[in-house]
Design a protein with these regions (language model features):
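Acidic, proline-/serine-/threonine-rich low-complexity intrinsically disordered repeat tracts
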Residues: 27-35
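C-terminal motif of bacterial Sec signal peptides marking the signal peptidase cleavage site
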Residues: 17-21
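Positively charged n-region of N-terminal signal peptides that target proteins for export
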Residues: 1-10
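Short, glycine-/Ser/Thr-/acidic-enriched flexible segments
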Residues: 3, 72, 331
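Extended amphipathic ligand-handling, pore-lining, and cofactor/metal-binding catalytic surfaces
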Residues: 89-325, 330-383
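Bacterial signal peptide processing site
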Residues: 23-25
Length: 383
């Protein structure tokens, strides 16, 4: 609490300093407060940003988000360059006004709550998460579709930067209760049955007694299991749809045509230390079972180890492919797809494949065409 109060004080001091030049009015005898240096002003904004890069929402969150934005706006261009987390406000991720947060009241008796981890990339949020929400609303016109994000840190980012308010799970469920919703279906856009899905279920079940019925749907890839060779129908459907979209986006006639051209498709997922990481091995087994020999599954986190970039690169090279198409195995092509996969800098998957000279990566002369997430491709709505 003391730190939160300090952050708010810093914000007020910074904004006041910028607008008054830290001087008193003419005729006043109070001593002038020394003006902040550019470095101090930038550091104060970094402190304000750090205060809202948290997973817990508190009574101070709204004020903290507003204070951070006001402090940022009060900086000069030169001062903004000194803010270590400057991209928090400065990075252009698209037009937030095109996104519908779906936080309206007047829900009715039946609600379909679409729960996503979330993304602060505006274009990805509109295309991927919004794509799923709109498809579900079209499929179930008698139900009111609403949104919730599980990542408070992302909710705060969007609120501070764009002034867009998105409900977290508790807010969305309480909104449903307050609106007299009787039947609620919770549809996660999470890819797999991991730690985040477990937490989602736990939060939802705390409200279960306040509805006549509550159904919590499975994530996109369905049940996990423990055997990497045992694959459910959901994974088969996702594999077929995702590969078909990748082939279409590449402008190829078929996956076999890409194979004949020496091209592999590499899907990059997130990865997890949760026991559900066997899902990625199951997806690789599914690709092989379908005869998709030139399709490989990797993860940012390299968990399981067989999905780490060096291992995937070895597998692609050993299979004799010299060209690679990178695609996100994620419902949302947000931060990971843009920064960990497609960015042309050391440590990314693009760089990892291109740097050694063994491979050509789609878009290597410019920027990698990372493709949309599975949400925008409506893969999730085909399952």
């Amino acid at each position: 609490m003391k730190k939160q109060l300090l952050v708010l004080v810093l914000a007020l001091a910074l904004v006041a300093c910028m607008f008054t030049a830290c001087g008193g009015n003419e005729g006043q005898t109070e001593p002038e407060t020394p003006a902040m240096t550019d470095e101090e002003a930038a550091a104060a904004v970094d402190e304000l940003i750090a205060a809202i890069q948290v997973q817990e929402r508190t009574e101070e969150t709204d004020a903290q988000c507003l204070a951070a934005k006001e402090a940022w706006d009060a900086l000069t261009d030169a001062q903004k360059e000194l803010v270590e987390e400057g991209d928090y406000f400065a990075l252009d991720t698209g037009d937030a006004s095109l996104d519908d947060p779906l936080n309206q009241d007047e829900i009715g008796e039946n609600e379909l709550l679409v729960v996503s981890f979330g993304t602060s990339f505006n274009d990805s949020r509109v295309a991927d998460i919004g794509g799923v929400e709109k498809a579900l609303q079209e499929a179930y016109p008698d139900w009111s579709v609403r949104r919730a994000f599980t990542a408070q840190i992302i909710i705060n980012h969007i609120q501070a930067r764009d002034g867009e308010f998105i409900d977290n799970m508790d807010q969305a469920l309480q909104r449903a209760v307050d609106n007299g919703v009787k039947n609620i279906v919770i549809q996660p856009t999470h890819l797999m049955h991991g730690a985040e899905y477990d937490e989602l279920v736990s939060q939802a079940e705390a409200y279960k007694d306040q509805f006549e019925s509550m159904i919590i749907s499975e994530p996109l890839l369905g049940e996990v299991g423990s055997d990497a060779t045992v694959i459910n129908a959901d994974k088969e459907a996702v594999a077929k749809a995702a590969v078909a979209e990748a082939v279409k986006a590449a402008g190829a006639d078929s996956l076999d045509a890409l194979k004949a051209d020496g091209t592999a498709i590499v899907f990059m997922g997130h990865g997890t230390s949760h026991t559900a990481n066997v899902t990625y091995s199951q997806m690789q087994a599914q690709m092989q079972a379908l005869g998709y020999d030139n399709v490989f599954i990797g993860t940012v986190e390299g968990k399981p180890e067989s999905t780490a970039l060096p291992e995937v690169k070895k597998a692609v090279e050993a299979a004799g492919y010299t060209k690679v198409i990178l695609r996100p195995l994620m419902v949302v092509a947000g931060d990971h797809a843009n920064n960990d996969m497609a960015a042309d800098e050391e440590g990314t998957w693009y760089y990892g494949f291109v740097n050694g000279g063994e491979f050509e990566v789609e878009g290597a002369d410019e920027a990698v065409d990372i493709g949309a997430g599975l949400g925008a491709e409506n893969v999730s709505c085909q399952i």
